[in-house]
């Protein structure tokens, strides 16, 4: 089966693959961030959002993977084989978990639309030849201030502006203010 864990969130494995592997913080840092920001929601029996559910599943999956790795590490006698397993998990599975954790934490922190806009912006930036692109990559935390996110679907109904009143050409008279009305 070809399952893309980002599909229902409007992203894809391919879109996240534009971000270099060293972009993503360590699993430990991401777990600490998730715990600090969303512990109550993650531990709650209530359904909060699809991103909370996906984040919860990624945390549980990583825990199970570490349990399995500990078992393998304790039962493999050959140090070279043990090293191969550890490297494989850290390189392949670790990257996938780091991507998942980063994506869902970022969606909860900045909003899904902003994260998707960031992924597209970064993808365009990284594929543009260096001579034709700005020197610095887009930064997620600054996107909400610098980009306009357009929602898909129907555009909001535009209101026509109300007609302006015609102003007289004569200078406006100032009313004299009483001392009591000045603040």
From Swiss-Prot:
**Sequence motif Bipartite nuclear localization signal, residues:** 158-175
Keywords, A to Z, come to: Capsid protein, Cytoplasmic inwards viral transport, DNA-binding, Host cytoplasm, Host-virus interaction, Microtubular inwards viral transport, Phosphoprotein, Repeat, RNA-binding, T=4 icosahedral capsid protein, Viral penetration into host nucleus, Virion, Virus entry into host cell
**Region (Disordered), start-end ranges:** 136-183
A cellular-component GO term for this protein: host cell cytoplasm
User: Where is the segment annotated 3 X 8 AA repeats of S-P-R-R-R-[PR]-S-Q?
Assistant: 155-177
Q: Name one GO molecular function term.
A: DNA binding
* PTM summary: Phosphorylated by host SRPK1, SRPK2, and maybe protein kinase C or GAPDH. Phosphorylation is critical for pregenomic RNA packaging. Protein kinase C phosphorylation is stimulated by HBx protein and may play a role in transport of the viral genome to the nucleus at the late step during the viral replication cycle.
S-S bonds: none
InterPro entries for the chain: Hepatitis_core, Viral_capsid_core_dom_sf_HBV
Which residues are annotated with the PTM Phosphoserine? 155, 162, 170
GO biological process terms held by the UniProt record: microtubule-dependent intracellular transport of viral material towards nucleus; symbiont entry into host cell; viral penetration into host nucleus
Where in the sequence does UniProt note compositional bias of the Basic residues kind? Answer: 149-176
Location comes to: Virion; Host cytoplasm
In which ranges do the sequence repeats occur? 155-161, 162-169, 170-177
> What is the annotated quaternary arrangement, including any partners?
Homodimerizes, then multimerizes. Interacts with cytosol exposed regions of viral L glycoprotein present in the reticulum-to-Golgi compartment. Interacts with human FLNB. Phosphorylated form interacts with host importin alpha; this interaction depends on the exposure of the NLS, which itself depends upon genome maturation and/or phosphorylation of the capsid protein. Interacts with host NUP153.
The family classification in the record reads:
Belongs to the orthohepadnavirus core antigen family.
Q: What does this protein do?
A: Self assembles to form an icosahedral capsid. Most capsids appear to be large particles with an icosahedral symmetry of T=4 and consist of 240 copies of capsid protein, though a fraction forms smaller T=3 particles consisting of 180 capsid proteins. Entering capsids are transported along microtubules to the nucleus. Phosphorylation of the capsid is thought to induce exposure of nuclear localization signal in the C-terminal portion of the capsid protein that allows binding to the nuclear pore complex via the importin (karyopherin-) alpha and beta.
Per its record, how is this protein called by name?
Answer: Capsid protein
What gene, per UniProt, encodes this protein? C
